Structure formats: structure tokens, C-alpha cells
A protein has these predicted regions:
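Glycine-centered helix-coil hinge/cap
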Residues: 1-2, 90
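Short, charged, amphipathic alpha-helices and their helix-cap/turn boundaries
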Residues: 2-20
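Domain-terminus/edge residues, biased toward the C-terminal soluble/receptor-binding domains
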Residues: 14-21, 29-168
Length: 168
């Protein structure tokens, strides 16, 4: 396990995840695991390039040894184009949701930490992102990361705008 965790941390550094450290392979509370929403978004972008992982996280149900396993990611069921990624909760970290969706060849990633309404907020963020970026002409060069970097006012304004648009 220790060798695997070393490899995880080396890969994190290679991906430029400067605010991430792994202490175990499963991510459960240890006091030594940490990351940021930005690093988790970068990690998701890299991970989704792996076709097998992408297939697993986007699977809604699977039958294994006669049992039906159901993915807990509600966005897979509710959000058009959702790829999935990571749901989770630990006592120390709280609720963390990393989701991605793809439409018209454009993929967006949303990350929230300790958001009590994360499913709805992710849908709102993704809706806002697809609306702002459009689908005809890329607004930014391909593969450029667009990040709001701690601009909470802009984040919540985007969520509120998307929620208001859905009510109309």
C-alpha cells in the first residue's frame, strides 16, 4: 500500500496538483489526505482521459455476481450528458462531489466541497457553463482551463442565474 501511495503522490506532482497529498489509496479520513477543488478538477480532467475509468464512472447500473449495483451519482440519472466522476462523504472532509458533463464535444467539470445542495448546484454550474461557452465556436483555446479561483460571488451568481432561468 505504501508503494502505491508513493506512486499516487508522484503522479499528483506530475499533474501539477500542488495542493494535494495522498496518505492512503481509498481517500478515507487519515488526517494526512488533503486536496483543493481546483486540484480535484485537474485530477478529474486527467482521469477522464482513461477510457476504462470513464466507462466505469459513467455506468448507471451493473450486475456483478448476480447483484445489481447502482451508481449513487444522481446526475447520471438527471443531467443530460453527465459522465459522472466522484461522489463521497467522510466526517473530516464532508461532502465532496466532482462531476463532469459533455455536450457537443465540450466537457465541463464541476467540483464542490461541503455543499448541502451539491446535486442541484452542479446542474446549475454545468448549465451556466454550457450556456456561457456555447457550442458553435470555442470561446477559449482548446484544453485551456477556465477557473473562477475562489471568486465566490461569481460562483453563486452563476448558480442563481441558472436556477432563475430554469424557473422561467
Amino acid at each position: 500500500e505504501a508503494a502505491f501511495v508513493r506512486q499516487m503522490n508522484l503522479r499528483a506532482r506530475a499533474l501539477g496538483l500542488t495542493q494535494t497529498h495522498f496518505a492512503n489509496p481509498h481517500g478515507l479520513d487519515s488526517g494526512e489526505n488533503y486536496s483543493t477543488a481546483l486540484d480535484l478538477a485537474h485530477l478529474a480532467q486527467a482521469a477522464l482521459q482513461n477510457a476504462q475509468l470513464r466507462a466505469v464512472v459513467s455506468t448507471k447500473t451493473a450486475v456483478c455476481a448476480g447483484r445489481t449495483l447502482t451508481n449513487h451519482n444522481k446526475l447520471l440519472w438527471r443531467y443530460d450528458g453527465c459522465i459522472g466522476v466522484k461522489t463521497g462523504y467522510t466526517r473530516h472532509a464532508g461532502r465532496i462531489l466532482v462531476s463532469a458533463a459533455e455536450r457537443d464535444g465540450r466537457m465541463l467539470i464541476a467540483v464542490t466541497i461541503s455543499d448541502p445542495d451539491d446535486w442541484r448546484d452542479h446542474a446549475a454550474l454545468l448549465d451556466y457553463g454550457f450556456a456561457v461557452l456555447g457550442s458553435d465556436t470555442p470561446a477559449y483555446p482548446q484544453n485551456r482551463r477556465i477557473v473562477w479561483k475562489n471568486d465566490c460571488k461569481k460562483f453563486w451568481r452563476a448558480v442563481q442565474m441558472s436556477r432563475a432561468a430554469k424557473r422561467r
